[in-house]
Every structure is written in C-alpha cells, then in structure tokens.
Amino acid sequence: MMKRFDKLLEKEVSGYKGKHSDLISKAPALYKLMTRLLDDPALPGRLSPLVIASIAYFILPEDVIPEEKYGPLGFVDDIFLCAFVADKVRKEAGTDDILIRNWDDKTPVIPLIEQILESEEELIGDNKQIIMDYIGYEQLET
C-alpha cells in the first residue's frame, strides 16, 4: 500500500537543518492544506484547478527547483506556490476562515502565508513567472 504523500513529505523534510529550514518544515502542512481545500464547499469553484495544480506541482519530480537536485531545499518553489494559491483562495473567498479551518499545524497559517509571499525573491529568485508558466497559470485563470 502506498503511503500518503504528506507522510512521505514529512519523512523527506524531517531533520533538515539547512537554508530556509523553518519554511521547509511546513511543506507537509501546506500540501495537506491544499488537499483539504479541495473538499471545502467554500472553495470558489473556479479556483479548484489552481489548487489541483499546486498539489500536482508538489508531486512532480522535475519542477523548477527540483528536490532531486537540491534535496529538501528544492521544496521552496512548491511552498511558494502553495502560499500564492492559499492567498488567492482567501482573497477570493473573502475570508481567512477557509484557510484557518483547513490548516493542521501549530504555526498560524495567515502570518506564515504572508511571510512566504514577502520572501518571494529570497526563496525563488526570479522564477515566479517560470513556475506560473509551468502550471499553466494563465490558462487556469481564464
């Protein structure tokens, strides 16, 4: 039987003490947030494909900053994308509650999302557009 992907993520990031380790440790919780949002009836329907894209991005072995090459540090782009999508969801839903009720971590989710988005350049450099192109963001937005 295959383990749940969030459990595999936990194993992969546990014990990581390198650059951005505080954020890398949140990868499993952010992945779980995306999966739970899909089941939330308050998720604006037009955002479902974007949420699905953020989940798929986590699972893809060869993304913009691949884990295969960078180890756990390679999750920074996945984490950024989840934060970007989560922020879009809360803005479109018109409430933080949709994120709060689907969050499964001790760290408060809203400040975490804001911290990740404010750290964009430090986390992913100038790769935001490449990540958005990779998931087909423009097509998902139409």
Predicted regions and their residues:
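Betabetaalpha-Me/HNH-type nuclease active-site subdomain
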Residues: 45-48, 56
